[in-house]
Amino acid sequence: MHTVPGIKVLYFGTPVVLITTRNEDGTPNIAPMSSAWWLNGNAMLGLGNSSQTSANIAREGECVLNLPSSDMVEYVDRIAMTTARREISAYRVQQGYRTERDKFGLAGLTEQRSELVSPPRILECPIQMECRLTVAHPVGGENSLSAFEVEVLRTHVEEKLVIPGTHYIDPEAWDPLIMKFCEFFGGGQPVHTSRLATGWNMPHTLRSLPVPQGDGSGDGSGDGVGEPVLSGSASA
């Protein structure tokens, strides 16, 4: 039997994407998000207009889409409630967001020079896509969200994921990190506690999930995943 519970969050399960862009001062930014999908050689990215990443993409016209594997969840969670914006609303502060301009340092990730665009790739991510902005579409009311259509210029893939002698990724070898209702999943199983789920008071945070084994850096923060739009960041 079906019911109509008035679902507030429609994040049924999509891959986490770490979007790298350049800030206005030239420094790199990372925003975790999961409102993304692909069609042929293009990607559609859903982002909040108040996010640093939205401003960077609109200004610079380029970005890199880095796909983390499920075993990279701790890197992602460290920046899940941070934003590169210098000013944060009182509501976001109450949720646990804070300003962080050095996302690479906080996450413990490594910059890798891109070949066709200015923003760096993330060395640790098995799949990296250098992209150029095609057009931005307004979504929703009050100019709150945008769907950025980007062209994938070049895709870099960890060699062990490629089926030998082909141009295809082995689906059994690739285990993407999935964001499902603000929780992290890999291989269909929860893989890590989520700062985002806690900040957004998701009821299922009361469940028992794997305890983080990292050093705890990035306490209380996130810039893309850390934004309501990790199926579409709103503040990163």
Protein language model annotation of sequence segments:
Residues 1-218, 224-236:
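Basic, polyanion-binding surface patches
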